[in-house]
Swiss-Prot record:
InterPro entries: CENP-S/Mhf1, Histone-fold. Its main location: nucleus. It comes from Bos taurus. This is Centromere protein S. It holds the Pfam family CENP-S. Residues 112-138 are annotated as: Disordered.
């Protein structure tokens, strides 16, 4: 039993380290991009510090999103939870809202196409069935 717990703990630690490495890599890439645009440099310590702060903020975001969903008696986080999280940053909230509306519009268009396709298929199958009935009557 203890060995299982230790193995799970080790897997969790390994997963956490991979996540931290991914955040560190992404922060490093963004810092390189900013450095080339602004003609400046970031030290490795600065990149590491930004990475740590970013990872910590992501952990806080995840906990907040879970709490928002739980408060609404849901087990799934939805866009309303994300909007609530972003409420203090007006530009971010605006961006998220616009993207959400774009996605909703695309979903409506897909639904309409699917409905039209089903109606066309139903119409074709009814027409072919009627044609078959006419042939058998003759």
């Amino acid at each position: 039993m203890e060995e299982e717990e230790w193995s799970e703990e080790q897997q969790r630690f390994s997963y956490l380290q991979r996540l931290k490495a991914a955040v560190h890599y992404t922060v490093g890439c963004l810092c390189e991009e900013v450095a080339s645009d602004k003609d400046m440099q970031f030290s490795k310590q600065t990149i590491a510090a930004i990475s740590e702060v970013t990872f910590g903020q992501c952990e806080n975001f995840a906990k907040d999103l879970e709490m928002f969903a739980r408060h609404a008696k849901r087990s799934t986080i939805n866009t309303e939870d994300v909007k609530l999280l972003a409420r203090r940053s007006h530009s971010l909230l605006k961006y998220i809202t616009e993207k959400n509306e774009d996605i909703a519009q695309l979903n409506l268009e897909k639904k309409a196409k699917k409905k039209k396709k089903l109606e066309d298929e139903n119409r074709n199958s009814v027409e072919s069935a009627e044609a078959g009935v006419e042939e058998s009557e003759n």
